[in-house]
Amino acid sequence: MIFDKDNFKEFDQELWQAIHDEEIRQQNNIELIASENVVSKAVMAAQGSVLTNKYAEGYPSHRYYGGTDCVDVVESLAIERAKTLFNAEFANVQPHSGSQANAAAYMALIEPGDTVLGMDLAAGGHLTHGASVSFSGKTYHFVSYSVDPKTEMLDYDNILKIAQETQPKLIVAGASAYSRIIDFEKFRQIADAVDAYLMVDMAHIAGLVASGHHPSPIPYAHVTTTTTHKTLRGPRGGLILTNDEAIAKKINSAVFPGLQGGPLEHVIAAKAVALKEALDPSFKIYGEDIIKNAQAMAKVFKEDDDFHLISDGTDNHLFLVDVTKVIENGKKAQNVLEEVNITLNKNSIPFERLSPFKTSGIRIGTPAITSRGMGVEESRRIAELMIKALKNHENQDVLTEVRQEIKSLTDAFPLYEN
């Protein structure tokens, strides 16, 4: 019987090896992808539990299946912890991803074809904020706002002007590659001025909001969406928050049965664990350290005239760098750094001139290295090594030196003890 196959390694050597190789890769790499992090063993244990066996369409106490008493407890814990952590009245923990959380919010607030104002992808927005290749751009009429060409920061007066000209039904605030504080109060004022809903996608900064190191959107947004990984350091999944009961009911209907069937209760359990971790006082220190590390790294790039630091700095967990003075494009920079076991992603920069498959920039984030215990000193050194590798990308001797020093760093800060 299949139930006898309890030795994973013996039963499926190929798959076991692939997972083992990935564990080794993560251990030996400096992870600087801003949307990635390192979850606790408790989060992994919850996600790998028997809850994966249980189907539970509906919501706690209102299920379409029997035998749901235990999963009701699990999901209720996740809901209450999310509400407490973010000081919100209502929470839906069922979205399978941030994109599905955004889709549910759109479904709850607007109709297909309605005008929506969202951040331009090259300026730091997300695919689901109106990109033509996304369901969002195909289903709704998105108009984009960008950043100021000089400061490379949000220009709220210009956003108001665009809103007045286009009269959107919904304004989306939030980003996937914007390094500065977002003023949600100003966004709400703009939304109110044109009688629009305000939705905030805080997927990237949720952990910083939770730890008190970025202003919360909850008092201002009609709906707030997020992922539960990234800076929140939980499993991959989505979460929707609101203080409006009528909107909460629409959100619930949009998630189920609107977009999804049965929730992934094993993932919801892992979300509950991560939310409890974020409620611990130590998480405030973690959020502070993420920002300190990002600012330390950004400063190294800022002090080198061969690189352009977008917006001249960072207030959060990430920053963007134009690398085209030292290497052809961001894609090549990504590949060179991967050679020396530093993982990040190519990224478009404001007013990008290259294709999204090449880009002028790279995006650098510090959640994962901070989770491993690295601090300001290590962050500065990593930035120095990145610059060394990029400036000497055709010199294999130099790349070997960098790779060896990266190995020393990763050995000193293991992914998981034992």
Swiss-Prot record:
- Signal peptide (residue range): none
Q: In which pathway does it act?
A: One-carbon metabolism; tetrahydrofolate interconversion; Amino-acid biosynthesis; glycine biosynthesis; glycine from L-serine: step 1/1
Compartment(s) of residence: Cytoplasm
Q: Name one GO biological process term.
A: glycine biosynthetic process from serine
What are its cofactors? pyridoxal 5'-phosphate
A molecular function (GO) term: pyridoxal phosphate binding
**Where's it mainly located?**
cytoplasm
The reaction(s) this protein catalyses? (6R)-5,10-methylene-5,6,7,8-tetrahydrofolate + glycine + H2O = (6S)-5,6,7,8-tetrahydrofolate + L-serine
NCBIfam families to which the protein is assigned, alphabetical: PRK00011.1
What is the protein name given in its UniProt record?
Serine hydroxymethyltransferase
Organism, by scientific name, is Streptococcus agalactiae serotype V (strain ATCC BAA-611 / 2603 V/R)
Biological classification of the source:
Bacteria, Bacillati, Bacillota, Bacilli, Lactobacillales
| Gene this protein is translated from | glyA
